[in-house]
Structures are given as C-alpha cells and as structure tokens.
Amino acid sequence: MIETARTPIAVIGSAFWPAASMLAFVVPFVGSDPVYATYATASMITFAVMSTNLFQYGVGVAEDRVQPWEPYVRSLPTGALPRFAGRLLSGFALMAFSLLPVVLIAWLCTAATLSPLSFLTAVVVTFIISVPFILMGLAIGYSVPPKAAVVVAQVLFFPLAFAGGLMTAPGGAPGFVEDLAPYLPTGASVRLMWAAVGDYPVEIRSILSLIAWIVVLGGVALWAYRRDEGRRFS
C-alpha cells in the first residue's frame, strides 16, 4: 500500500475514469432521473471495480515479479498467504478510494437514491463482483512481464466494459450486447449491481455466469502462479 501511495498517478488514475464518466455522461444526461441515475451509478461502480482490479493486480503483480527481492520473499517460510492477504487489503483500499468519487458525485450531483438496506446490499455485491476481476488481474500478472501486462489490461478494459453493457442503461444496449452481456464477467456483475440498487430482476444466468468465471479465472490464476513458481525455483 505504501509503495502504491508513492506513485500518485496510480492512485489518482484508478479514480479518474469512473469519476470523469459520471461527470461527462451520467450527471448531464440522466442525473435528474432517480431510477436511471441510480442504475448508471451502479454501472460506474462496476466499471471502477473492473478497472482498479485489472490494473492493481495485473500490472502490480507483474511489476513485483521483476523486483530483485521477489525471489527471496517468496522463499520465506511464512508462505504465500500473508503476502496475498496484504495484497488483497491493499487492493480493497485502492478500490474503495476509486469508488469514493463516484459515490460522492452520485450523492451531490444526481437524483440517485438508495435505502439503507439497498446500500448495504450494494456494498456486499461490490465485494462479490470484485472477485473475478481480482483473479483476472492475478492471471495476467503471473503470466506476462510488466509492459505486456499493461497492454493486456488496456486491451481487455474497454471491450469488457462495452460488451458487458456498462455504457448503457438496463435494456438500452444494442441487441448483440444484450444477448452477450450476461455471459461476460462485466455483464453478469453489473446485473447483480442493478438488482441490488433497484427493481432489476435477479437473473440466474448472470449468477451462474459469474460463478463460472470465478472458477475458470481462479484456475488460470493458480496455473499461472504455479508455472511462475516452477520457473523460478525448479
């Protein structure tokens, strides 16, 4: 966390795009409509969760792997759990920082409304939907070098947002996006967020899709980690 804070652009960048999207698109176009403003805020929260975790874990892990102390740290008898727990705590802190401007803009500049129960539900769902993007970031970080990790994260970033329906209101995306989105991690995640903050129905296919992505990405991340271990210590 201290290392991340020493690079202000990494912290500021994670919060900039979701907040900028709120100010550029949500506030002027749907800010006065309570329903659409609430759904749009949920979409931007999903956007922030995806982008923060893709870059925090994808690029962060890849950069850590090339540091001279990394082989020594990974050989310590404490094992990988303390380091992974620290990385998770750091990642959640950065994710919370990136979400804060979105929530403040929604509160101060739009008509978005949430009951206390819906707010708590949205918080829980936010942590749940972060899991596939954390695993995706780890898979990237343990698979490729830092420069390639930046490229891979950038290549995945916008297509996942667009194809997942994060750029439109519920039901407002082109037909092919509406058909594809529930089966993508972004589309499944945002549908759970919409259900948490509004009257959007809970879709079983989105839940099953999210579980499937967690299993698949978890397997890929574990494989990439073990492959990296084998290369370093075999």
For the regions a protein language model found, what residue spans apply to each?
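Alpha-helical membrane-inserting segments
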Residues: 24-28, 54, 58, 101, ...
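Juxtamembrane loop-helix boundary motifs flanking transmembrane segments in multi-pass membrane proteins
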Residues: 3, 76, 80-84, 111-115, ...
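Hydrophobic alpha-helical segments of integral membrane proteins
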Residues: 1, 8, 65, 69, ...
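Transmembrane helix-loop junction
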Residues: 26-30, 63, 72, 107, ...
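Alpha-helical transmembrane segments and their short interhelical loops
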Residues: 80-154, 200-211, 216-219
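Transmembrane helix-boundary elements of multi-pass transport/secretion proteins
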Residues: 2-67, 95, 115-122, 172, ...
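Helix-loop-helix units of permease transmembrane domains in multi-pass membrane transporters
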Residues: 60-92
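Transmembrane helix segments
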Residues: 25-32, 141-183, 187
